[in-house]
Amino acid sequence: MVIAAAVIVPLGLLFFISGLAVNLFQAVCYVLIRPLSKNTYRKINRVVAETLWLELVWIVDWWAGVKIQVFADNETFNRMGKEHALVVCNHRSDIDWLVGWILAQRSGCLGSALAVMKKSSKFLPVIGWSMWFSEYLFLERNWAKDESTLKSGLQRLSDFPRPFWLALFVEGTRFTEAKLKAAQEYAASSELPIPRNVLIPRTKGFVSAVSNMRSFVPAIYDMTVTIPKTSPPPTMLRLFKGQPSVVHVHIKCHSMKDLPESDDAIAQWCRDQFVAKDALLDKHIAADTFPGQQEQNIGRPIKSLAVVLSWACVLTLGAIKFLHWAQLFSSWKGITISALGLGIITLCMQILIRSSQSERSTPAKVVPAKPKDNHHPESSSQTETEKEK
């Protein structure tokens, strides 16, 4: 516990102090620049947000040494980062969102990576605030309220100046064995395909995304994330402790124009993809890899390392000058203030770690199962919205 604290507190100081500086700059740009030019604000914010998010990329790449192996054909891999894309992914681990950031960073669009998330995420210190300034979409999981919020948020992206990814975790919550068992019981009672490795997708958000972005988003990236049997599952706590893991990601590209037109058909297409995803994961379990799939080299760029070293130098020099000026350690009052500051940083880190834990994620609300109605493919167990966290 002492060792963990000795690691987490310095990383927390670096992340939260630099993050507050980024948030302040984002707020100033939001107030002064966005009313005059939304595109200029977006271009500036893209660079500014990336300087913060690259710190978490550094933790994955350099501090913990997590290895992310990507399986995709050359055509798909070469398209990534060059076009707007809707990213649909299973929600397998506590750091799926960070895996997405790694892939976006490698593709050159980390600063314009977006996601649909639950509303409470935007209140997370520093990281949630940066997401709000970056136009992430936050939902309340109440479709009566979220339908219009999601529609307006999606349509607002039509004039985005750089290629963006919008991530949508249509399972609605992170995968756990307990949630899988509940999904299997529901599927059996509703005469649906019984899932083995995924949860039943909730399709309202996906249908809304396709319907509202079809005209300006050309591609859907179907990502399948899993952890090989030989690797421990990655968590935020393991990352901060510097403990490595391995993550396998399979990516398949679908053309948006090939999707059906009607809402019911779009929903069924999404369910069919998750049936196929389930079968793909069966093959992965048997082989501990994605057999017959081409592995792409995503490397480990030094950009995140350079950003972290730059932040560390700036903050260290700033701290030395501040401590010399304020003479905090020359009195009990100063020592108390310093201890309080460290306590707040530690608390914020704990909030970030706990918010990422899959066993603490809130399961989607489920209404009692009803007899299957072939004329209404939106199953009765589906929640009103999708969420990311």
From Swiss-Prot:
Location of the region described as Disordered in the Swiss-Prot/TrEMBL record: 357-389
Bias type Basic and acidic residues, positions: 370-389
GO molecular function: 1-acylglycerol-3-phosphate O-acyltransferase activity
Primary location: endoplasmic reticulum
Catalytic reaction annotation: a 1-acyl-sn-glycero-3-phosphate + an acyl-CoA = a 1,2-diacyl-sn-glycero-3-phosphate + CoA
Gene Ontology biological process: CDP-diacylglycerol biosynthetic process
EC number: 2.3.1.51
Transmembrane regions listed in the UniProt entry: 2-22, 305-325, 333-353
Pathway given in the UniProt record: Phospholipid metabolism; CDP-diacylglycerol biosynthesis; CDP-diacylglycerol from sn-glycerol 3-phosphate: step 2/3
Record key words, sorted: Acyltransferase, Developmental protein, Endoplasmic reticulum, Lipid biosynthesis, Lipid metabolism, Membrane, Phospholipid biosynthesis, Phospholipid metabolism, Transferase, Transmembrane, Transmembrane helix
GO cellular component: endoplasmic reticulum; endoplasmic reticulum membrane
Compartments in which it is found: Endoplasmic reticulum membrane
Residue span of motif HXXXXD motif: 91-96
Tissue: Present in roots, leaves, stems, floral buds and siliques (at protein level). Widely expressed. In contrast to LPAT1, it is not expressed at higher level in leaves.
Membrane topology: Multi-pass membrane protein
Quaternary structure and interacting proteins, as annotated: Interacts with GPAT9 and DGAT1.
Family designation: Belongs to the 1-acyl-sn-glycerol-3-phosphate acyltransferase family.
Function per UniProt: Converts lysophosphatidic acid (LPA) into phosphatidic acid by incorporating acyl moiety at the 2 position. Has preference for C-18-CoA substrates compared to C-16-CoA substrates. Required for female but not male gametophyte development.
Protein name: 1-acyl-sn-glycerol-3-phosphate acyltransferase 2
